[in-house]
């Protein structure tokens, strides 16, 4: 329920966080389940946020288990349809919890849902494809639903990491009949074949984007300059907090986006209340200008250094 409600707002927020998001083969965003989305994983939770925001149907995401350690993190992530899955590096004692993740994935798929798994099983803040884990192949091999399962490869890439106003390239591949990816009797042989085939499908979909070549006119640049200084105190505070919380991790972009998603509406609410107390009409006009200026900042400059 919460996921469905906030998804449109996430799409709006992405337009203030990313300079441009290019999507190829958009028609596949309308596909219905059961679908296992297999994607690369260059930028932590932001990958899932972007893919989920543009898909028409709800998506459930398999996400790294160490992000679920704190109760409030666990609560929030589960509201976003995220399911924890653990790697050996996150503690051998947690590996038994993966049975829950795979069982949940099977239930979702057997009920005609969509599950997203990042087949590399690791995020290194790079568009370079990493070695594959066996989780995606396991889900396909264990699937027992009545409706044929499709596997949809998606490549996602960024022009920069740990930075604002990024350009994103997302390319959706062709849906593949899962049975064609596991044609053998031996489970181990099927896993190797599955990963090899998916790599062949996924590699061409990862296209390094160039920074969006947007050349605003002088008025847009002027508005962005005003907006830059209007937002600078908020941006500085959020930036410093995000850096402190994500030091030596890959979560900076995800945490920065999450903070802005929550705090920027509060910022606008406070400014709006102050302006409304002074003049309702002019307060509304100025508030609209502030919102427009925020978008022009993304087009013209990087407000966080």
Language model region names:
Residues 4-10, 14-176, 225, 239-305:
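Soluble catalytic domains of membrane acyltransferases
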Residues 184-204, 212:
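Long, charge-rich alpha-helical interaction segments
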Residues 167, 193, 197, 217, ...:
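Generic recognition of short, well-ordered alpha-helical interface segments
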Residues 176-180, 215-220:
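Extracytoplasmic/lumenal ectodomains and periplasmic regions of secretory and membrane proteins
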Residues 200-214, 237-242:
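Juxtamembrane amphipathic/hinge helix adjacent to a transmembrane helix
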Residues 168-175, 180-190:
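Long hydrophobic alpha-helical segments that form multi-pass transmembrane helix bundles
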Residues 216-244:
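Core alpha-helical transmembrane segments of integral membrane proteins
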């Amino acid at each position: 329920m919460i996921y469905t409600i906030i998804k449109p707002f996430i799409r709006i927020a992405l337009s203030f966080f990313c300079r441009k998001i290019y999507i190829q083969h958009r028609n596949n965003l309308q596909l219905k389940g059961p679908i296992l989305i297999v994607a690369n994983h260059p930028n932590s939770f932001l990958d899932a946020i972007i893919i989920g925001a543009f898909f028409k149907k709800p998506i459930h995401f398999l996400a790294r288990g160490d992000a679920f350690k704190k109760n409030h993190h666990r609560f929030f992530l589960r509201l976003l349809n995220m399911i924890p899955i653990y790697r050996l590096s996150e503690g051998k004692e947690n590996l038994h919890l993966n049975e829950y993740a795979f069982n949940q994935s099977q239930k979702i798929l057997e009920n005609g849902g969509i599950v997203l798994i990042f087949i590399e099983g690791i995020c290194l803040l790079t568009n370079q494809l990493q070695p594959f884990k066996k989780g995606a192949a396991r889900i396909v091999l264990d699937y027992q639903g009545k409706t044929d399962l499709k596997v949809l490869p998606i490549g996602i890439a960024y022009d920069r990491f740990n930075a604002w106003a990024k350009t994103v390239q997302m390319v959706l591949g062709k849906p593949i009949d899962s049975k064609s990816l596991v044609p053998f009797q031996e489970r181990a042989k099927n896993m190797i074949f599955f990963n090899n085939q998916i790599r062949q499908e996924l590699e061409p979909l990862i296209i390094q984007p160039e920074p969006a070549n947007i050349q605003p006119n002088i008025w847009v640049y002027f508005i962005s300059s005003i907006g830059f200084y209007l937002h600078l105190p908020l941006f500085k505070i959020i930036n410093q907090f995000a850096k402190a919380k994500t030091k030596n991790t890959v979560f900076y972009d995800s945490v920065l986006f999450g903070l802005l998603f929550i705090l920027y509406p509060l910022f606008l609410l406070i400014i709006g209340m102050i302006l409304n107390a002074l003049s309702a009409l002019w307060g509304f006009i100025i508030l609209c200008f502030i919102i427009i200026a925020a978008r022009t900042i993304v087009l013209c400059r990087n407000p966080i250094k």
